[in-house]
């Protein structure tokens, strides 16, 4: 082999390996974007006749949650933003719930407890505020909240970015603010 042939082969090999190396750089996966897409698909999967879109004017813009009321509760006792509630709930990642149902890991578990502390509605994540204000005292429901209404600051329900949530809830009591 001549030195020119050897140089040509070496140059060709370097060019080919450079092209292969550069093309692999474009295949990075954006984990947050993947999680967002997966959670949006999971949320949209609840758009059927079993669930209704629930909204509250002035909360969350045009945002909505999916709500399926299992037990109506006392329709004479509704929930307002200024109320406090005794809200028993089990919280799951929507993607986990779709895969494993009751075997899914719970982010919060109070549904089976006998007593819990009351919480101001205003302190709940926005999506849960919307859902609760569409329920009545004594109601039981399942709720699906999109990632953009899951703005919880609670350390017991902390989630990754772009995580939609699935709730099983029982609204035991509505506590109206006292008037002075």
Regions found by a protein language model. Name each.
Residues 20-24:
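C-terminal motif of bacterial Sec signal peptides marking the signal peptidase cleavage site
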Residues 5, 9-17:
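Sec-dependent signal peptide hydrophobic core
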Residues 2-5, 25-180:
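Cross-family detector of peptidyl-prolyl cis-trans isomerase
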